[in-house]
A protein has these predicted regions:
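N-terminal membrane-targeting hydrophobic helices
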Residues: 1-166
C-alpha cells in the first residue's frame, strides 16, 4: 500500500502542532497542503501519474530542496505573516527530510550547493525534532504575555469579590 501522502501529512502536522493553540488550525493547512502538493513534481518529472512511475525516478526533482522550502515559506510569510510562513517551510522541510531518510531515490535537499543524496533515518529524526522545537519556540515567542486575574492571584480560586477601596 502506498502511504507516502499520509506519512507526509502526519509529519507536517506534527512539526507545527505547537503553533495550533495560539495561531489556530490554519497553520496545519499552511504546513500540510504544501507537504502534499510538492509531490506533483514527481508526476511532472515522470510524465505520468502512475505510482510505479513516480516512485521509480532515478533522483527526486530539484523542487525537493531546502531552497524551494525557503522560497515557499518566504512567499507565504509575505502574504500571510511569519507564523504561516514558518508552517509552510516546516511542512515542506519535514517532507524533504522524510524523503531523504529513506533508501529510495536520492533527494536534492541542499541543491544547488550539494548533489542529491540520502541522509538516513537518524538525521531525519534529529532534524525533524529540530523543526518541532523551533515551532515550540515560535509559539512561545508569539504568545501574548500571560496575566492572571487579581482574584486568582489571591489564592481563592477566583471566587473573591473585587478589591475594595477605602
Amino acid at each position: 500500500m502506498y502511504s507516502d501522502p499520509l506519512q507526509h501529512a502526519c509529519l507536517a502536522a506534527a512539526v507545527v502542532a505547537p503553533l495550533v493553540r495560539r495561531s489556530g488550525r490554519g497553520v496545519l493547512v499552511a504546513a500540510v497542503v504544501p507537504a502534499l502538493a510538492i509531490d506533483v513534481d514527481h508526476a511532472v518529472a515522470a510524465r505520468s501519474v502512475r505510482v510505479g512511475d513516480i516512485t521509480s525516478l532515478a533522483t527526486r526533482p530539484r523542487t525537493h530542496s531546502a531552497l524551494g522550502a525557503l522560497g515557499a515559506g518566504a512567499v507565504v510569510a509575505a502574504a500571510t505573516g511569519p507564523v504561516h510562513g514558518w508552517a509552510t517551510f516546516a511542512g515542506l522541510a519535514s517532507h524533504l527530510l522524510h524523503d531523504a531518510g529513506d533508501r529510495a531515490a536520492p533527494t536534492p535537499v541542499l541543491w544547488p550547493f550539494a548533489p542529491a543524496r540520502q541522509l538516513g533515518r537518524a538525521r531525519q529524526l534529529a532534524l525533524s525534532s529540530a523543526l518541532l522545537i523551533a515551532s515550540l519556540a515560535l509559539s512561545r515567542a508569539t504568545a501574548a504575555p500571560w496575566t492572571e486575574p487579581l482574584s486568582a492571584a489571591a489564592g481563592d480560586g477566583g471566587a473573591a469579590s473585587p478589591p475594595r477601596t477605602a
